[in-house]
A protein has these predicted regions:
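C-terminal nucleotide
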Residues: 2-13, 17-20, 27-83, 96-99, ...
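Residues at or immediately flanking beta-strands
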Residues: 84-88
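Short acidic, glycine/Ser/Thr-rich loop/turn "cap" segments at secondary-structure junctions
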Residues: 91-104, 118
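DPxDG-like acidic metal-binding loop motif
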Residues: 103-125, 158
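Short glycine/threonine-rich catalytic loop with a Thr-x-Gly-x-Asp
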Residues: 104-106, 288-295
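Short hydrophobic alpha-helical segments that form membrane-spanning helices or hydrophobic packing faces
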Residues: 115, 299-300
């Protein structure tokens, strides 16, 4: 039996803009894990604790994402001369509580998890680029129009600067060419680890809301113009530079700017709870913003001294915002859940 795991992710900056090829986003891995156990079996058995039953490879709508991942990895392994054999795959870790998702990128986590499990089962090594391409190929074949930023972060398990690629072009190639040929091509993305040169606490607050409306989606599409994209790219690049050079004030300014850019896209991104989460950092050596799609789910904060961290956590608790995760970055004591 082999055990593998994948993490979740949250955006620090660049969400929405990253949907446009060539744009930048800064994304942080969150060690809230999904796990998979895989072992040899007489027949295929796939189980996820999202559901109350298991399946084989016969199409099942609930298990479609997992089954399609298995199919693509088997296609890849066949090109590598691997003899396929049946297995039992057991997936656990729903990244939700009381039926409400945390918004940590669980579909991306599932795809990467299945790929890692199968490659481990067949004792095949894969670097970050291959994992990213395989997982992205699964989602592109499904018609997923996401940026693949969650995949970039999940395969890295770190704080990463991601530059997006032309997904339409690669999806077209996947329709026309053999998988192996497409995997061998240059896709035009980049993934780089970012190491901050300053000390701070990173906190994740969960609002327990999910409220992405069609009105919000339309507003965002209408407002994602050239000016927004240029501002977003400059903000992310300056944020990364400030983190690497240890410039606390610039980090705060750039995250504030990233937050304002999101507000300019749609008034619905900041729900009342997310606005409270953000404004709780008033008078503190800290900065907070919505993370990801907005309209609910999670917000993040960076706090630059212990008193600010303590006060921010207290304010969040009083507002009914749950501290989902806390990590001490640049400290000797790395994290606390």
């Amino acid at each position: 039996m082999t055990l593998v795991k994948t993490c979740g992710k949250l955006y620090w900056a660049g969400e929405y803009a990253i949907l446009v090829p060539g744009q930048l986003a800064l994304i942080k891995a969150i060690p809230i894990y999904m796990t998979a156990e895989i072992k040899a079996s007489d027949g295929y058995r796939l189980y996820s604790d999202m559901f109350t039953y298991s399946v084989d490879l016969r199409p099942d709508s609930s298990y479609a994402l997992i089954q399609e991942t298995v199919a693509l990895v088997e296609e890849y392994l066949t090109t590598q001369g691997v003899d396929l054999r049946p297995f039992s795959l057991d997936i656990r870790g729903k990244m939700e509580r009381e039926g409400k998702k945390f918004g940590l990128g669980s579909s991306g986590s599932v795809v990467v998890l299945v790929i890692k499990a199968m490659l481990a089962f067949y004792e095949r090594l894969a670097d970050r680029e291959l994992l990213f391409k395989l997982a992205s190929a699964v989602l592109l074949k499904r018609g997923d129009n996401g940026s693949m930023g969650d995949i970039a972060c999940i395969v890295s398990e770190d704080l990463v600067l991601y530059q997006s690629f032309d997904r339409e072009k690669v999806a077209h190639l996947l329709e026309k060419e053999e998988l192996q040929a497409v995997l061998g091509r240059e896709w035009g993305f980049s993934i780089a680890n970012v190491e901050p040169a300053l000390e701070f606490d990173f906190l994740v607050g969960w609002t327990k809301e999910v409220a992405v409306s069609s009105h919000m989606v339309k507003q965002i599409k209408d407002n994602m113009n050239a000016s927004f994209l240029q501002s977003s790219e400059e903000t992310v690049a300056n944020l990364v530079k400030a983190l690497q050079m240890g410039q606390e004030e610039t980090v705060i300014d750039m995250l504030e700017q990233a937050s304002q850019l999101l507000e300019g896209l749609s008034s619905d991104i900041y729900t009342p709870s997310l606005r409270q989460l953000k404004e709780a950092r008033q008078d503190l050596r800290a900065v907070a913003k919505s993370s990801g799609a907005g309209g609910g789910d999670c917000g993040i904060a960076l706090s630059f001294d212990q008193d600010s961290t303590t006060l921010l956590k207290k304010r969040w608790a009083n507002l009914g915002i749950e501290l989902l995760y806390q990590e001490r970055i640049g400290h000797d004591d790395e994290s606390e859940g």
